[in-house]
């Protein structure tokens, strides 16, 4: 649990101070500035990683870990204890403390005790256990926070004590570390206690999808047929992950998943579930999958159209989309929803065959008021070897401070396209 006064305000290295303050944008800016000064030799983010963990800023710690922080270089006394992390209820904090490089620091007896602690929180309920520990009957302040790069959790504060509601996800993680095989039914129950953005949901889905066995597949099939759309939504994600984590397109459960999603796409009526189903078809542009996607090109819910746009591309071993897919991409690049436009432009870029109708529509997006659309259009045009990407990239300028990693991905395609032209120009 985190209590008021957890952190100190001592002056420190700017990167460490930014991590301790929870300023993610400043952390990224400082790392970029250090890269510039060192000509590409990235500043070691390990001390900032430790500071972020000490302050329970888990999303920043997750970012720093991805950017090269070395948990093994941090002494145990400079990190929160595993008990503190479990009590706090942050799956990301527990993940960081049990990173593969430092997992040996925890004997099995301690891991068993932490599993029992997580189970106690989970079974009691976060609110009830927080009230029991604080002895307060005051109103609980609730918010939703980003726990790691991908997932959110609930955060509750009462009587100066703050906890997160990720104990179910922590329990799943510790059980896996200990080699305990949790039943499919229990994992589904933990997921459905939360929503689709919560770590408990994604962790249960990933764990189940890695079980390439009849019991796990039967669980997905049962959820697909459920009357409750929330249960169907979890079933759709689970089915999609059976495909995502397949070793090959020919793997048994991959084939089953694609067939199930294709049939499901023609019958699902709930827009949220339908969007998840369609996302599962994005790797397969065969005739049946494409037909299932095209059926929903003009769906009234943007999330569904976005899934269609993301799924339409080229069939395997070809750079020529079908006429219907080609027309749908042109339509979706002019969609009123910005995210649909971006997804369609990305798929059109994947075709990379210089199609004039596609590239002209992409070029029209260079005048879009949002920078993220312009970036996607630059990248897509570069993939089609369309010289309009060069001037567009120049107009956009360098990546913005704090966004270099993301924006460089889009802009460097135009830079790569321009270099051969410069090398062959007379001079």
Predicted regions and their residues:
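Amphipathic alpha-helical scaffolding segments comprising HEAT/armadillo-like alpha-solenoid repeats
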Residues: 36, 60, 72, 180-189, ...
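Structural detector for internal amphipathic alpha-helices that build alpha-solenoid repeat scaffolds
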Residues: 13-20, 46-55, 79-88, 115-116, ...
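Ankyrin-repeat C-terminal turn/loop position
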Residues: 34-36, 68-70, 101-102
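Short inter-helical turns and helix N-cap capping residues of alpha-solenoid HEAT/ARM repeat scaffolds
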Residues: 227-228, 269-270, 300-301, 336-337, ...
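Ankyrin-repeat boundary/"N-cap" motif
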Residues: 8-17, 39-51, 73-86, 106-121, ...
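TPR-adjacent "capping" and linker segments in tetratricopeptide-repeat scaffold/adaptor proteins
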Residues: 1-10, 188-195, 207-208, 223
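Ankyrin repeat structural motif
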Residues: 23-31, 57-66, 90-98, 126-127
């Amino acid at each position: 649990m985190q209590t008021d006064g957890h952190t100190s305000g001592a002056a420190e290295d700017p990167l460490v101070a930014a991590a301790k303050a929870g300023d993610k944008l400043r952390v990224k800016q400082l790392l970029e500035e250090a890269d510039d000064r060192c000509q590409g030799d990235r500043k070691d983010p390990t001390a900032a990683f430790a500071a972020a963990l000490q302050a329970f800023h888990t999303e920043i710690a997750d970012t720093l870990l991805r950017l090269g922080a070395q948990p093994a270089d941090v002494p145990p006394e400079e990190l929160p204890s595993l008990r503190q992390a479990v009590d706090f209820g942050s799956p990301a904090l527990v993940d960081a403390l049990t990173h593969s490089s430092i997992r040996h620091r925890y004997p099995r007896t301690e891991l068993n005790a932490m599993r029992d602690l997580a189970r106690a929180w989970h079974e009691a309920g976060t609110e009830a256990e927080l009230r029991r520990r604080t002895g307060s009957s005051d109103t609980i302040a609730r918010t939703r926070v980003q726990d790691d790069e991908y997932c959110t959790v609930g955060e509750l504060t009462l009587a100066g004590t703050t906890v997160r509601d990720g104990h179910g996800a922590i329990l799943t993680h510790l059980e896996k570390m200990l080699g305990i095989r949790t039943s499919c039914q229990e994992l589904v129950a933990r997921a459905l206690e939360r929503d689709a953005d919560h770590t408990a949901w994604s962790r249960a889905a990933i764990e189940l999808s890695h079980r390439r066995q009849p019991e796990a597949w039967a669980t997905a099939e049962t959820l697909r047929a459920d009357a409750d759309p929330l249960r169907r939504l979890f079933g759709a994600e689970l089915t999609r992950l059976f495909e995502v984590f397949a070793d090959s397109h020919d793997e048994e459960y991959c084939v089953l998943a694609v067939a199930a999603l294709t049939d499901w796409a023609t019958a699902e009526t709930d827009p949220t579930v339908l969007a998840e189903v369609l996302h599962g078809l994005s790797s397969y542009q065969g005739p049946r999958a494409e037909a299932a996607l095209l059926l929903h090109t003009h769906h009234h819910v943007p999330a569904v159209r976005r899934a269609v746009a993301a799924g339409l591309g080229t069939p395997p071993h070809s750079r020529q989309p079908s006429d219907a897919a080609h027309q749908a991409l042109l339509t979706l690049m002019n969609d009123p929803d910005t995210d649909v436009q971006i997804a369609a432009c990305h798929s059109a870029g994947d075709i990379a065959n210089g199609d004039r109708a596609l590239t002209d529509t992409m070029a029209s997006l260079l005048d879009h008021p949002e920078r993220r659309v312009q970036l996607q259009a630059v990248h897509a045009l570069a993939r089609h070897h369309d010289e309009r990407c060069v001037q567009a990239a120049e107009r956009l300028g360098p990546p913005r401070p704090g966004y270099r990693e993301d924006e460089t991905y889009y802009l460097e395609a135009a830079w790569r396209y321009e270099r051969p032209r410069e090398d062959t120009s007379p001079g």
